[in-house]
Regions:
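Charged phosphate-binding loop/patch that engages nucleotide di/tri-phosphates or the phosphate backbone
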Residues: 167-218, 226-239
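Divalent metal-dependent catalytic cores for phosphoryl transfer on phosphate-bearing substrates
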Residues: 10-14, 37-159
Length: 240
């Protein structure tokens, strides 16, 4: 366990409301479980989970004000909906208030709400853990998402992004372009993962099937030509 964890927990318990603190513990626990499943550093996963919502102690106007005063970039989407800023502000607080200097942890905290196009392992772990943690009960399709998270992290990440986009679409809410870009990128990543898995299992893709059919056809034609040549040769010997 990272030596800072106990003190951070104590501090967060004082600063966050009880429900938010319980959610934080659930995400931290789930991050560690996913880290064990996918061979990632447990301490880094735990810290990312603990601090991902550390800026949720502030209301929306205060988050916007703090980001502006600290020189944290604010997009048009974030200006319209400052609640999105808790991720960026949380990453800043993790560095400046809690002494975290690990770039993977800071990246995961900063993108856990919208995602991003070049998500690393910890980015995906935190993004998924935030959705499936044990205390969540209202998110869409939770049983399937929880199962999928421990089978295929990329596909789980994509499925959660698509679910969130569908939900936001029903509310007619503006969608952050980062989320759309992240989802499109994750579709490509998930498709590549499926292709690699299929290749590893010996499943043939379209080009492989075409190649095998061509080879088989040549073999069959070769046999036909050999048998035909043999019969013709036999007839010549007989006539002779």
């Amino acid at each position: 366990m990272d030596s800072r964890v106990i003190e951070i927990r104590k501090h967060l318990k004082k600063k966050l409301d009880p429900m938010r603190f319980e959610h934080t513990l659930g995400v931290s626990y789930t991050c560690q479980a996913l880290a064990m499943r996918y061979g990632y550093d447990l301490d880094k996963a735990e810290l990312a989970g603990l601090l991902h919502d550390c800026a949720k102690r502030y209301d929306r106007p205060t988050m916007l004000e703090k980001c502006i005063s600290r020189g944290i970039p604010v997009s048009e989407s974030e200006e319209r909906d400052p609640s999105l800023l808790h991720a960026k502000l949380g990453a800043w607080m993790a560095r400046e208030k809690y002494g975290v200097d690990d770039e993977e942890i800071l990246s995961a905290i900063a993108c856990h709400t919208t995602g991003k196009t070049d998500m690393g392992m910890l980015d995906k772990i935190l993004y998924v853990a935030d959705y499936i943690e044990p205390r969540r009960c209202k998110a869409a399709d939770l049983p399937r998402m929880r199962k999928l998270a421990f089978e295929d992290l990329d596909l789980a990440c994509l499925s959660i992004m698509e679910s969130i986009l569908r939900y936001l679409g029903t509310l007619d809410c503006p969608i952050d372009p980062l989320t759309i870009a992240a989802c499109n990128r994750m579709r490509a990543v998930a498709a590549r993962s499926r292709e690699q898995a299929a290749a590893g299992n010996g499943e043939a893709g379209p080009e492989k099937i075409k190649e095998e059919n061509t080879v088989e056809s040549v073999k069959r034609n070769g046999k036909t030509r050999s048998r035909g040549a043999g019969r013709e040769k036999g007839r010549r010997y007989k006539n002779y």
